[in-house]
Regions:
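N-terminal polyanion-binding entry modules of DNA glycosylases/AP lyases
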Residues: 1-122, 126, 184-210
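Catalytic DNA-binding helix-loop module of base-excision-repair DNA glycosylases/AP lyases
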Residues: 51, 123-169, 195
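A short linear-motif detector with a strong N-terminal bias
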Residues: 61, 80-81, 134, 175-179
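C-terminal end-helix/capping segment
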Residues: 76, 159-187
Length: 210
């Protein structure tokens, strides 16, 4: 068992039982596997996040692929997105609102208001603040970016529906916890809340059938 898993188990008996039931989850391997499904650069990852909002994984992948096709198979540079024909972007599958969002992302990058190269040097809170300044990018998206792109070790998205469901089941709560309650329950998991999040998501995949 990894040092992080041992610390989680020691900090919380419910998490200890979950770890024993599910076995070892290697944080780096799992995050790397997930990252391989997304663009490698920060700009592409955020662009892909906007495209995929409120869509199934399959639909998001299809639409993102169509957008890449508009730009010869490559992630469009911010300048290209701003100059792109809206009709073409809509035909690829973007809604009018998402066209506005991807262009706002491009504008922030070009204006230097979102300095992607320095995100690695910022705290988690500062990264979230930078990202949510872009229209269409909310706190949840910023938290997933922290976890799966920047691979930060202590990310817990209290508002994530899957995590809330898992916490309700594992902690035997009568009602689904509020985001604030999830963060309260997860306080003992610091500084390994990213690993705890993976265990909670994994618990849903391994839940017994009704």
């Amino acid at each position: 068992m990894s040092s992080a898993a041992r610390q989680l188990a020691a900090a919380d008996p419910t998490m200890a039982a979950l770890i024993e039931r599910l076995g070892e989850i290697d944080l780096e391997t799992r995050l790397r596997r997930r990252s391989e499904e997304r663009p490698a650069d920060a700009y592409g990852a955020l662009l892909r996040a906007i495209v995929g909002q409120q869509l199934s994984t399959k639909a998001a992948r299809t639409i993102y692929g169509r957008i890449l096709d508009l730009f010869e198979g490559s992630t469009p540079a911010p300048e290209q997105l701003l100059e792109a024909d809206e009709i073409g972007l809509r035909a690829a599958g973007l809604s009018g609102r998402k066209v506005e969002y991807v262009r706002d992302l491009a504008s922030h990058v070009l204006a230097g208001e979102l300095e992607l190269d320095r995100l690695d040097d910022l705290s988690d809170e500062e990264v979230v603040e930078e990202i949510v300044a872009v229209r269409g990018l909310g706190v949840w998206t910023a938290e997933m970016f922290l976890l799966f792109h920047l691979e930060r070790p202590d990310v817990l998205s209290g508002g994530d529906l899957g995590i809330r469901k898992a916490v309700q089941v594992e902690y035997e709560l009568d009602e689904m916890p509020t985001p604030a309650r999830v963060l309260e329950i997860g306080e003992p998991w610091r500084p390994h809340r990213s690993l705890a999040s993976l265990y909670l998501w994994e618990s849903l995949a391994n839940a017994p059938a009704d």
